[in-house]
Amino acid sequence: MKVIDQFKNKKVLVLGLAKSGESAARLLDKLGAIVTVNDGKPFEDNPAAQSLLEEGIKVITGGHPLELLDEEFALMVKNPGIPYNNPMIEKALAKGIPVLTEVELAYLISEAPIIGITGSNGKTTTTTMIGEVLTAAGQHGLLSGNIGYPASQVAQIASDKDTLVMELSSFQLMGVQEFHPEIAVITNLMPTHIDYHGSFSEYVAAKWNIQNKMTAADFLVLNFNQDLAKDLTSKTEATVIPFSTLEKVDGAYLEDGQLYFRGEVVMAANEIGVPGSHNVENALATIAVAKLRDVDNQTIKETLSAFGGVKHRLQFVDDIKGVKFYNDSKSTNILATQKALSGFDNSKVVLIAGGLDRGNEFDELVPDITGLKKMVILGQSAERVKRAADKAGVAYVEATDIADATRKAYELAIQGDVVLLSPANASWDMYANFEVRGDLFIDTVAELKE
């Protein structure tokens, strides 16, 4: 990693632990900062805080005392999940204390070039695809960021022979200043996380931070299926490389079932190893990045053909007596479920949907669920999802939780059918995150097979 001294002897407050906060605290300590960690979880239930204290780092747990900010901190590094209307952050900003996320730290120390991927849907799959293609081409793509490996941790081991392939959420991108990828990808922009950002325009502004420091020597890969992306083209200094499944563009595009890059066929769409129109978009974004990094077509084709998907993202789980089970727990909004359904014959799909009630109706989903074999509906949003099912003329049953839903879906299916968990809702009404929800689905499928 690069040796930098800008944090040496500076007092830094790390707000919130989890993986990224713990990694940031250790890195800052290594860089000579005087680190204080503040986390809301009580110390006795907080193994990360216990470990940091043993390493000599000051920890304050069990709450977020505002008076802590009366100390003269030069910087706050916040966990990306903590919103900016948190009183600690509001007070820090009022005092003129810069508030960053650990992604900024990763950029500052990284010897490896960075490819950053953000967007509303498809981030993790596209990040993984890019990482696998680059690695197959000998460029060693190191996955990091929102994909589960703290960027500041991976950046410490990356050399200039590697490439940091970094999945970035809007939460993370709100806390960057100098962050400068050589290639950035925005998969799409849809109205999500409005409860965090306050408005769609603020959400887009957070995503757009990915290109703030880019120049004409850098490349910004945008989804020209969206008029919004086309409108944003004039607002960046970077060189824009478009991709589209709807039109021929000066980049990566779909035409007559083939995936092209600037007029050259790379592979057939039906050769991609995972189903769904959204994965065609993800593959096109990957092809654009790969060609910008001089990867040959054969390597791209072989890697994307063998691509098996990502856990919780239209993940094939198992086949029980001819019934296939797919875990798409990551589909926490309507668009993601629409794209998941596009890869299947509705008449053979039993869809499990429902979750956290954010107050939105599901009318947009009606055309996509029309013709489904059956639905199994659960969660806080069940009444709203049932209204959409009624409009679509789809029969449904209700379930109490994911295990119950999985069993009922299997009872409704016959050989040749698909049981698809694609909730179109966040998980927080019942489960800590979409991973827990997806894991319970996987576990129940395993029990059904016994």
UniProtKB/Swiss-Prot annotation:
Originating species: Streptococcus pneumoniae (strain Hungary19A-6)
Subcellular location: Cytoplasm
UniProt entry tagged with the keyword Ion transport: no
Entry EC number(s): 6.3.2.9
Gene3D superfamilies for the chain: Mur ligase, C-terminal domain, Mur-like, catalytic domain, NAD(P)-binding Rossmann-like Domain
Reactions performed catalytically: UDP-N-acetyl-alpha-D-muramoyl-L-alanine + D-glutamate + ATP = UDP-N-acetyl-alpha-D-muramoyl-L-alanyl-D-glutamate + ADP + phosphate + H(+)
InterPro entries: Mur-like_cat_sf, Mur_ligase_C, Mur_ligase_C_dom_sf, Mur_ligase_cen, MurD
Main localization of the protein described in the UniProt heading: cytoplasm
GO biological process: cell division; cell wall organization; peptidoglycan biosynthetic process; regulation of cell shape
GO function term, MF aspect, one: UDP-N-acetylmuramoylalanine-D-glutamate ligase activity
Key words, A-Z: ATP-binding, Cell cycle, Cell division, Cell shape, Cell wall biogenesis/degradation, Cytoplasm, Ligase, Nucleotide-binding, Peptidoglycan synthesis
Family, per entry: Belongs to the MurCDEF family.
Pathway: Cell wall biogenesis; peptidoglycan biosynthesis
Positions annotated to bind ATP: G119, S120, N121, G122, K123, T124, T125
PANTHER family per the UniProt record, alphabetical: UDP-N-ACETYLMURAMOYLALANINE--D-GLUTAMATE LIGASE
Stated role: Cell wall formation. Catalyzes the addition of glutamate to the nucleotide precursor UDP-N-acetylmuramoyl-L-alanine (UMA).
Lineage: Bacteria, Bacillati, Bacillota, Bacilli, Lactobacillales
Name of the molecule in the record: UDP-N-acetylmuramoylalanine--D-glutamate ligase
Any one annotated GO CC term: cytoplasm
